[in-house]
Amino acid sequence: MTTQVPPSALLPLNPEQLARLQAATTDLTPTQLAWVSGYFWGVLNQQPAALAATPAPAAEMPGITIISASQTGNARRVAEALRDDLLAAKLNVKLVNAGDYKFKQIASEKLLIVVTSTQGEGEPPEEAVALHKFLFSKKAPKLENTAFAVFSLGDSSYEFFCQSGKDFDSKLAELGGERLLDRVDADVEYQAAASEWRARVVDALKSRAPVAAPSQSVATGAVNEIHTSPYSKDAPLVASLSVNQKITGRNSEKDVRHIEIDLGDSGMRYQPGDALGVWYQNDPALVKELVELLWLKGDEPVTVEGKTLPLNEALQWHFELTVNTANIVENYATLTRSETLLPLVGDKAKLQHYAATTPIVDMVRFSPAQLDAEALINLLRPLTPRLYSIASSQAEVENEVHVTVGVVRYDVEGRARAGGASSFLADRVEEEGEVRVFIEHNDNFRLPANPETPVIMIGPGTGIAPFRAFMQQRAADEAPGKNWLFFGNPHFTEDFLYQVEWQRYVKDGVLTRIDLAWSRDQKEKVYVQDKLREQGAELWRWINDGAHIYVCGDANRMAKDVEQALLEVIAEFGGMDTEAADEFLSELRVERRYQRDVY
C-alpha cells in the first residue's frame, strides 16, 4: 500500500517537531499511546495557576454554555466551531457534551446554546437522553433567567425530521426561557445554515454578554478533542481494502461481510466503540441508468462546489442516489408536473411512504420526464459518508480496522437495487483497492476504565461488531472482569456471525457467558429481549455487581424492546415499581453504565 503522508498544511507541528514526536513514540504499544494522548490532554487543559488564583467574580462574567448533543459527530463539529467563534469574539464560553452536563445546574444558566442531532424515530442522541428526560420530567426547573438558542441537525428523508431540536426548543421556552434566536432546522447539507447561524449567535451574544478580559477567556469543555489526527471527514485517509469475506451462510437471507482495511503507516488511531466513516462512490451502472432515463448523455457540464465536472462524474462521486426523500419526490413532481406524483404533494405521510419505497431511479422510471443536467443536480442531495461500528481493537490488529457490513439488497419490480456504501464495499472495491476513510470517535460507548468491571453486551445482527472489538481489547488487556454476550439472528446455521471467535473466547474464559436467540429456528420467534427476561435473576446480580450494559444495533425496534426488557428485569428483581425502575436505568445512563450505539 502507498505510504500516506499527512498533509503538512493540516499539521500544527513543523517537520522537526513531528520527527521528534515520532521518534519518542515509535516503540509505544497502542495502550501506551492512548495513555500518552490522555496525559497530554490533561496537561493542555490544566488552567494556569495564576488564572486559577484570581478568577473573575461570577457576577462580572455570566458565561455562555454550549451543550453538544451529537450522534455521528456533525452536531459536535458545529458546536466546536461556534465555541471557537465565541472565543475569537473574546466571550466567556464553556462547551460540554450533553452526556457530561450536570443537568440540575441548568436553572443557573444565563446564556444557553443547544446544538443537537436526532436519531431513530425522533429521539435525541444517546448522550442527550438523560438531559431530555430530565427536562420533560416534573423535576425540570423554571428557566425565567435563561436566554437560549437551538440549532437542530437532521435528515429530511426521515419522518421525524429534527425532532430532538424541536423538543429542546419548545421545552426550554415552556420552562420560561427566552429565545435568543428562532430555532434552525438543518438538513443533511447543513454547513451553510450552520455558518450563517453561528454568525447570528455571535452577534446576539456580543450585545448581551460582557467581554472577557484576555486573561479570563476560558476555553473549557472541549468536546471529544483528545483525538488529534490529520485525517478527518473532510480530509479522509486513502486506505486499502485487504479482506472482503461473506460471513453468513449460503442459504442465509442476509449478506453480511467482514471487511478489513489496511491503514498502512498512516498512524490513524481508534478505540473500541469508535465508528469508521466510509466515503463511497455510486455504482456506475446506476448512474448510467438514471442518465439514460432522463434522456441525457452524461458528459453535460455541471457545477459542483464551484468546480465544473461532467454529469457522470458528479453523480458517481458527489450526489446521493440510493436514498430518496419526501423533498426530492415533491420537487420532482412540481418540476415535471407528473400526473402520478402531483397528487402526493402536500400530503407528508404519502410523500414519506413513496420516498421510503421508491428509489430515485425508479421514481424517474415510473414517472418519466426530461430534465437538463443542472436541474437534476439541483434536485439531489450531496453524498455523505456512512458510519460503521468498528469491529476490531488495535491492541490485536494494529494497523488495520475491521467493520461488519450488512449489505442492503432488494428488488423493485424485478430490478435489483442495493445500498450505496454497503454494495460499494461488498461488490465494487477490489482487494487492495482504495477506500477513503476516517475515524468518528464515540466517547459515549467505551469499555469501563476498571478492567475488573463486568460487561454485558447486547448486539443482535451486525450490532455484534463493537463487541468483537471489546473482546479483543479485554483479551489483550487480560482484564479479569466478567463478560456476557447476548446475540441474535434468524438462523443458527446460517447467521451466527464470528461463531468460531466467540467459541474460542468461551473456551479461553474471556467470554464468561453467551446467550443466543435464533428467531426463525423454531415455531415461536425468540429475540434477545426474550433472553434478557429469561436470565433476569442473573442479569440483576451482574447489575448489582456494578456491570456496565452496552446495546448496539437497530434503534427503531430492537433498542426499544431491549430497554423495555431491562426495565422489566430491574422492576421484578430489584423490587421496584415502573417509575423507580425507569429512574434506576436513567441513573445507570448518567453513570455511563448503560451505553447504546444504535442507528
Curated annotation (Swiss-Prot):
Quaternary structure and interacting proteins, as annotated: Alpha(8)-beta(8). The alpha component is a flavoprotein, the beta component is a hemoprotein.
Keyword presence, Transport = yes
The protein, known as: Sulfite reductase [NADPH] flavoprotein alpha-component
What class does this enzyme belong to in the EC scheme?
oxidoreductase
Q: Which HAMAP family match?
A: CysJ
Q: What does this protein do?
A: Component of the sulfite reductase complex that catalyzes the 6-electron reduction of sulfite to sulfide. This is one of several activities required for the biosynthesis of L-cysteine from sulfate. The flavoprotein component catalyzes the electron flow from NADPH -> FAD -> FMN to the hemoprotein component.
Is DNA-binding tagged as a keyword?
A: no
What keywords would UniProt list here? Amino-acid biosynthesis, Cysteine biosynthesis, Electron transport, FAD, Flavoprotein, FMN, NADP, Oxidoreductase, Transport
Cofactor(s) needed: FAD; FMN
Write one Gene Ontology MF term. Answer: FMN binding
Q: Which residues form a coiled coil?
A: none
- PANTHER family referenced in this protein's UniProt entry, alphabetically: NADPH OXIDOREDUCTASE A, NITRIC OXIDE SYNTHASE-RELATED
| UniProt EC number | 1.8.1.2
Q: Which reaction does it catalyse?
A: hydrogen sulfide + 3 NADP(+) + 3 H2O = sulfite + 3 NADPH + 4 H(+)
> Which Pfam families does its entry note?
FAD_binding_1, Flavodoxin_1, NAD_binding_1
Q: How is the cofactor bound?
A: Binds 1 FAD per subunit.
The entry assigns this protein to a family as follows: Belongs to the NADPH-dependent sulphite reductase flavoprotein subunit CysJ family. In the N-terminal section; belongs to the flavodoxin family.
Identify the residues that bind FMN.
70-75, 117-120, 153-162
* Pathway(s) of this molecule: Sulfur metabolism; hydrogen sulfide biosynthesis; hydrogen sulfide from sulfite (NADPH route): step 1/1
* Chain positions recorded as FAD binding sites: 322, 356, 386-389, 404-406, 410, 419-422, 599
